[in-house]
A protein has these predicted regions:
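Conserved ATPase "switch" residues in P-loop NTPase domains
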Residues: 46
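Polytopic endomembrane small-metabolite transporters, centered on the Drug/Metabolite Transporter
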Residues: 84-86
Length: 344
């Protein structure tokens, strides 16, 4: 995985693909506005194949997300949105029958999905819930985390031989971007409960596979392309699920992170923005001297040095060539002397 799929001529990343599963923040929008070229590129994609939106956000329902996307100009309905609470429901149904009482940490996104499937919702451990589903909401505080711990420890605490009731987390994002900066995410809150109960939850969201499997099942497709801005969730998750992946450099991870990506987190395609979905993607070629060529750019790893043989147009093809050369070398990037120009 990672730029090494067999390709002998330049075709678009959508060649042979029957659906696109796009992340939201950093791919479709940033803050209140859409990212340049995202809306028109995704609407164009939808004219030819399925487009789904995969989000770890557990605080909003699919209808709420779809309304936001439609306001940005996207052709979208609630069924196009796959949320981590929806993926969590399938995990829950495998463990607890509908009609059971479920303790919830989180907001509208989780409660809506539970009620759709006939589960009853509680916020009290004293009511004897059959399972705990934990997701993020800005108002979640110590009281909710403590109550979840009491529910999980009621039948199977740290010193118990009992397995305890099922505990499902929508996602394990350690941080989330908000208007004022980076804030603790659901993974941080799950970790707090873990400290009190001595075990880990089953996780539904990226980079775990249930959310990708839910999307594939819903759209009835076989060869989706996952598009995301984070290597540690979008790309890692796509690779784990056996799906093609493209990282777009409009969000969290940029050139430096992509160059340093470990084998499990390497994308098949590197795009500046979503216009790249519809543009021919250059072939990656390796010359006899070991130099990797992408377009007019050529990069070689010489011992511990990364050498720019030709920077071509000095654009994205240079980054693509450098990634392929570094990844093929098998050497961790911290052990290499990398030209600073590759990071810009």
């Amino acid at each position: 995985v990672g730029l090494f799929r067999a390709r002998t001529e330049a075709t678009t990343p959508l060649e042979g693909i029957d659906a696109v599963f796009a992340d939201l923040d950093g791919v479709v929008y940033a803050g209140a506005g859409s990212i340049p070229h995202a809306v028109e590129s995704l609407n164009r994609t939808k004219r030819e194949r399925a487009v789904g939106y995969i989000t770890n956000n557990a605080s909003r329902s699919d209808a709420s997300v779809a309304q936001h996307l439609a306001e940005l100009g996207l052709d979208v309905v609630p069924g196009d949105v796959v949320t981590s609470p929806q993926a969590a429901m399938r995990l829950l149904e495998e463990r607890v029958e509908p009609g059971a009482l479920v303790f919830v940490v989180g907001g509208e996104g989780i409660v809506t999905e539970l009620e759709k499937r006939g589960y009853r919702v509680t916020r009290s451990a004293d009511e004897g819930p059959a399972a705990v589903v934990q997701g993020f909401a800005p108002e979640v505080g110590w009281r909710e985390l403590a109550e979840a711990s009491f529910a999980l420890n009621a039948h199977g605490g740290p010193d118990s031989t009992e397995a305890g009731i099922p505990w499902i987390a929508t996602n394990m994002d350690w941080t989330i971007p908000v208007a004022r900066g980076i804030a603790p995410g659901n993974g941080t809150l799950v970790s707090a409960v873990h400290t009190a109960v001595g075990r880990f939850p089953v996780v539904a969201g990226k980079p775990e596979t249930p959310i990708f499997e839910e999307a594939k099942r819903r759209f009835g497709v076989e060869r989706p392309l996952v598009v995301g801005d984070r290597l540690d969730t979008d790309i890692l998750g796509a690779n784990r699920a056996g799906m093609a992946s493209a990282v777009v450099l409009t969000g969290i991870d940029r050139a430096k992170q992509v160059l340093a990506a470990d084998a499990a987190s390497r994308p098949d395609f590197i795009l500046d923005d979503l216009r790249g979905l519809h543009e021919p993607y250059p072939v990656v070629e390796t010359a006899r001297d070991g130099a990797v060529r992408v377009g007019k750019a050529r990069v070689r790893v010489d011992g511990r040095r990364v050498v720019i043989v030709s920077d071509g147009d000095g654009g994205l093809d240079l980054l693509r060539a450098a990634c392929a050369a570094i990844w093929q070398s098998g050497t961790k990037i911290h052990a290499l002397d990398v030209p600073a120009s590759l990071y810009s």
